[in-house]
Amino acid sequence: VNPILFSDHPQQDLQALLANLAYSKIFILVDSNTQINCLPILFPELKTENHRFVINPGEKNKTIATCMEIWAAMTEAQLDRKAILLNLGGGVLGDMGGFCASIYKRGIRFINIPTSLLSQVDASVGGKLGVDFQGLKNHLGVFNEPEAVLIAPKFLETLPTQELRSGFAEIIKHGLIQDKAYFESLNIQDWMDSDWKKLIQHSVAIKSKVVSQDPKEAGLRKILNFGHTIGHAFETYYLDGEKHLLHGEAIAVGMICEAWLSHQKLGLPAVELEKIRHTFLSVYGKIRIEEKEIGLVLDLCIQDKKNEGNTLMFSLLNSIGDCTYNIPVSRSEIRDSISFYQNLLLD
């Protein structure tokens, strides 16, 4: 597994990292936000020989069409196989940039510099790369590890609150699936005042431990998908609508629904289900789901990559801190779990 570097001085640490890698050219992938907010931190005086390409931010741009633009720019920059791609951005950019690097000339090296809380705790670890296709999340992709991941909590200062909140959902998830004490240590009331550096390090350690035991998701790694079967379906459903949900906001809905399924199917204690419900509703509030939307969300669940044949396979909780995988769930059970969410009252 490639080095994950926690950095309080990203500019110096990146230069030191690059000095140890023999490369022909550097190509920098940024989005319109990170170009303004993050690039100057890394390269205060950026030289023109550093080729760069700017993409539009957001999940809706995580497509093959954007990849083709990136590949065209890489080709125009005459990158050879010794070039290195720097991905400076959130999860969308890292997923797509790594995918582009893996395909270009059968693969060039890349370094991920995640700038959002979500990508620092989650997307930058574990080598899953890809893009959305025909409305399906991460439908096309590969497993490939970056040369290095540079995690600088400093970049979080540039994030809007809603983006911080989105990333916090994955931190909560790591506690729910692997570490009850971690979950209980999270400050839900004043989550904005969290010690992000400490939480990121702990979350990355949890995820790295799981991924190192099962890099290609044959078994144990599936526990990281808790909340994601239903959560991804909501995220995908709302991608085109005006009721746009960030990844973490959608996963928060998914985790409440899947905690209910855990209670029904695995006996997750009612008091723990209540604790999970309370945690997510107090941080994320509640979204309104119309009756007519549920069928479409269910259809999207069926398309999930984790399924085997027509059976929907879920990762569910035996208890907080103990997650298991490959639990078959029927369409009607998913519908019931969404009804449970719909009927919840805010405290």
Question: How would you describe each model-predicted region?
Answer:
Residues 71-88, 97-112:
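Non-catalytic interfacial helical region
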Residues 169-171, 270-347:
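C-terminal charged capping/lid subdomain of soluble metabolic enzymes
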Residues 76, 145-148, 154-161, 169-181, ...:
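Generic secondary-structure signature for well-ordered alpha-helical cores
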Residues 185-295:
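Active-site segments that bind and position negatively charged phosphate/pyrophosphate groups
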Residues 1-84:
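ATP/NTP phosphate-donor binding region
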Residues 99-191:
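A glycine/threonine-rich phosphate-anchoring loop and its flanking beta-alpha core
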Residues 92-99, 120, 232-233:
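Short glycine/serine/threonine-rich phosphate/pyrophosphate-binding segments
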